[in-house]
Structures are given as C-alpha cells and as structure tokens.
Design a protein with these regions (language model features):
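C-terminal interaction module
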Residues: 1-54, 156-232
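Internal, hydrophobic cores of structured domains that mediate oligomerization or house catalytic pockets
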Residues: 49-162
Length: 232
C-alpha cells in the first residue's frame, strides 16, 4: 500500500548533505528533552545564518512561525509532550531542519526522536570534516544512531524516495517498506541497522551486527557509546 503526502516546494538541493539522527526515549523521560534547546543548538552549529529558514511550522501546520526566534519564544507549544513534528525549510537553498517524535503504541511507552539536518555546512567528504561534525553532534545530545548521505536531485530526504511533481504541487509516496523501517528503528539500541551509508554513527550493538566486510571501512572510536564508520 502506498500513501501520498504533500511536501514544501523548494529549490532543488544542490551539493547538500543530509544527516539523520535517532535517539530512543521513554514516556517517563520524554519531559527531560528540551525541544527549544535542541533547535537552538542545531541551528547555531550547523547553519551559517542565525535565521536560515523562511518556512517554519509545528505539528504539521498547527502553527506557522516567521523565524526561529519566534518559534523558540513559544515555550508552551515546544513542550516535548505536545510536539510531534517541527519542520524548518529554506525554500531557496533547500536547507532543512526537521524534528519528529514517533510514539509507538497507544500507551506511548516507547518514543523515537528523529532529527533531519540538510545543510551546506555539512562536509562529509573529508575524514577530518566527518569526525568534527560527529563530535559536534554528540555535544548536542547522546544519540543512539545517525547516518549521512549526499542528497541527489529529486530526492525527498525524509523518505529517501523520489519526489513526484504534479501540475500545482509535489508529493512523495510512502511505501510499506519505509513504514516498516521506521518501526524497526525503535530497536536501534538492540543493534538494528537499516543499511550502511557514506557516514554512520553506530552504537556498540550495531557495530556487532554489521556485515564482516564492513569492518574494512574506516572506523573511528567517538566516545564510550558510539563509533564513526565511513564508507566513502
């Protein structure tokens, strides 16, 4: 079964890298996440302009904002228990910051935090640049998993599928494979790895589960929890 959802139209992303980050949360610890601080830190570290976005919305259009500053001032709405999705886009450059909370089950016992970065400041070609970015990322939060790739023309970063252009809008199809993958990402702490990308931040369990030939790629010990695996 395939579903369609509407997306922002923007300039084609050229020479941009994307990084997706994941953190496993629980209902009892969800309130510990400061969404405002997360947004502020990511914008400061990975976007050159202090106000890099012209399309900002929360919870799929529940409210729109004219700037990051106005978003951060809305502290009540930024509660991690009230936020399910934040989307920030630069319609000219194609740069993006997307934050999503995926709640598993009606009781919301398990929550997966996903952050998507698309920025011209992400240089994942050089080893030194990749390690620097990895260190910056772990200074923001204790991630459980992350990966990065270059955005090809016509690719929707969220679903990693091709964008369909219609007469007056654009859309992407959400496949059953994508839906199943998002469910399995709740098991990253148990070693689940969807696939290897040019840039990977893996936890210890994931390192144990990757194919043996992957051990030939460049590996770097990042901290007590994570490794960087480069497959360029």
């Amino acid at each position: 079964m395939r579903q369609l959802f509407k997306i922002f139209s923007s300039k084609e992303k050229e020479n941009l890298w994307a990084i997706k980050l994941y953190k496993k949360l629980w209902k009892t610890t969800l309130s510990d996440v400061s969404v405002g601080n997360l947004v502020a830190r990511l914008v400061t570290l990975f976007f050159k302009d202090g106000e890099p976005f012209d399309c900002i919305e929360i919870n799929y259009g529940e409210k729109e904002y004219c700037s990051i500053k106005s978003l951060l001032l809305d502290e009540k709405r930024l509660s991690s228990r009230k936020v399910s999705h934040i989307s920030c886009l630069n319609s000219q450059s194609g740069e993006e910051l997307v934050i999503s909370f995926y709640k598993k089950g009606e009781e919301y016992g398990s929550v997966l935090l996903e952050v998507i970065l698309v920025s011209s400041s992400l240089n994942l070609i050089e080893v030194s640049g990749s390690i620097r970015i990895a260190k910056d990322l772990v200074s923001v939060a204790s991630w459980d998993y992350a990966y990065g790739f270059m955005v090809s023309k016509g690719l929707d970063v969220r679903t990693e599928s091709k964008i369909r252009k219609c007469l007056f809008s654009t859309s992407v199809s959400v496949s059953k494979t994508y839906i199943e993958r998002m469910k399995k990402l709740h098991s990253i702490h148990l070693g689940y790895v969807p696939q290897l990308y040019p840039f990977n931040m893996l936890n210890k369990k994931q390192m144990e589960n990757i194919p043996s030939e992957s051990k030939l790629y460049s590996q770097y010990y990042l901290d007590s929890r994570l490794y960087v695996l480069l497959c360029n």
